[in-house]
């Protein structure tokens, strides 16, 4: 059985790591490069960096941060936010990222998924999905709707349909974020995670809501996710990556304990 990945997520704004609840009330919690180094040394399998306001503010890429991270850590990392073109993808990969995450830009221009996969390989293209629970209706039969621009804009797109479409277009992985659960630390949206995981064949990363090790266990077992994104539970020192992995290992979830 493939090992399950534990992936710290660093939301970056103006070159600093921030954290909020449901994409709001963000506070500064540190330097992203230094935090990445700490998590790398603690045993993270990968790290994700999101420039959380680049798409909304139509700003450029955080290339300087990417370069510094690439010089500091030696595990895969992905970068999202502000990536609108294949040229942006190339520049970010050349700066040292292993993967590119597209979210708002892919919803507005789905061809960026197929173009990126063709040029760089599907393994480099991650679809970020920000999802809200809504009333089921004709356009949203799953009851989960895609939102973009940091949760500001509802798109009238069904999350399950979009996950399948992104896979068809060539995405190699999905990072599935529940905005309803984001930063609340009460657990991932297991229903959403399982729905997407069972209906695509590419890896799914559960995101939004981790507060205790049991939450990761539930996402990786009941939710059938391939990986789990964590933020608040390690950013604020409530848990360690080593402690989380030990908890999972003791309960039969395959994780990489040591390099």
UniProtKB/Swiss-Prot annotation:
Q: What is its EC number?
A: 4.3.2.10
Q: Which UniProt keywords apply?
A: Amino-acid biosynthesis, Cytoplasm, Histidine biosynthesis, Lyase
The yes or no answer to whether the keyword Chaperone is present is no
**What does it catalyze?**
5-[(5-phospho-1-deoxy-D-ribulos-1-ylimino)methylamino]-1-(5-phospho-beta-D-ribosyl)imidazole-4-carboxamide + L-glutamine = D-erythro-1-(imidazol-4-yl)glycerol 3-phosphate + 5-amino-1-(5-phospho-beta-D-ribosyl)imidazole-4-carboxamide + L-glutamate + H(+)
**Recorded GO terms, molecular function?**
imidazoleglycerol-phosphate synthase activity; lyase activity
Q: Does Lyase show up as a keyword for this record?
A: yes
Q: What class of enzyme is it?
A: lyase
GO terms (BP aspect): L-histidine biosynthetic process
The pathway entry for this protein reads as: Amino-acid biosynthesis; L-histidine biosynthesis; L-histidine from 5-phospho-alpha-D-ribose 1-diphosphate: step 5/9
Q: Which GO terms describe its cellular component?
A: cytoplasm
Q: What is its main location?
A: cytoplasm
Q: Which residues of this protein are catalytic? A: 11, 130
Q: Which InterPro entries match?
A: Aldolase_TIM, His_biosynth, HisF, IGPS_HisA/HisF, RibuloseP-bd_barrel
> Where does this one sit in the cell?
Cytoplasm
Q: What does this protein do?
A: IGPS catalyzes the conversion of PRFAR and glutamine to IGP, AICAR and glutamate. The HisF subunit catalyzes the cyclization activity that produces IGP and AICAR from PRFAR using the ammonia provided by the HisH subunit.
Q: How does it assemble?
A: Heterodimer of HisH and HisF.
The text of the family note is: Belongs to the HisA/HisF family.
**Stated name of the protein:** Imidazole glycerol phosphate synthase subunit HisF
Q: Which organism is it from?
A: Desulfosudis oleivorans (strain DSM 6200 / JCM 39069 / Hxd3) (Desulfococcus oleovorans)
């Amino acid at each position: 059985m493939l090992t399950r990945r534990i992936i710290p997520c660093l939301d970056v704004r103006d070159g600093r790591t921030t954290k909020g609840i449901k994409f709001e009330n963000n506070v500064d919690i540190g330097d992203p490069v230094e935090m990445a180094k700490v998590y790398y040394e603690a045993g993270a399998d990968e790290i994700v960096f999101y420039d959380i306001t680049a798409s909304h503010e139509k700003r450029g890429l955080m290339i300087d941060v990417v370069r510094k991270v690439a010089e500091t850590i030696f595990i895969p990392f992905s970068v999202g936010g502000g990536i609108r073109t294949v040229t942006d993808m190339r520049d970010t990969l050349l700066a040292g990222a292993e993967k590119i995450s597209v979210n708002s830009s892919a919803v507005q221009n789905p061809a960026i998924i197929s173009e990126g996969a063709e040029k760089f390989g599907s393994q480099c293209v991650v679809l970020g999905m920000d999802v809200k629970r809504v009333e089921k209706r004709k356009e949203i039969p799953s009851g989960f709707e895609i939102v973009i621009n940091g949760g500001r804009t509802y798109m009238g797109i069904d999350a399950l349909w979009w996950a399948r479409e992104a896979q068809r277009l060539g995405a190699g992985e999905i990072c599935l974020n529940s905005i309803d659960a984001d930063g609340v630390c009460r657990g991932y949206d297991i229903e959403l995670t399982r729905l997407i995981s069972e209906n695509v064949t590419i890896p799914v990363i559960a995101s939004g809501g981790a507060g205790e090790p049991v939450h990761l266990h539930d996402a990786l077992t009941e939710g059938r996710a391939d990986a789990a994104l964590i933020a608040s539970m390690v950013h604020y020192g409530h848990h360690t990556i080593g402690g989380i992995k030990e908890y999972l290992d003791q309960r039969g979830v395959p994780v990489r304990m040591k390099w």
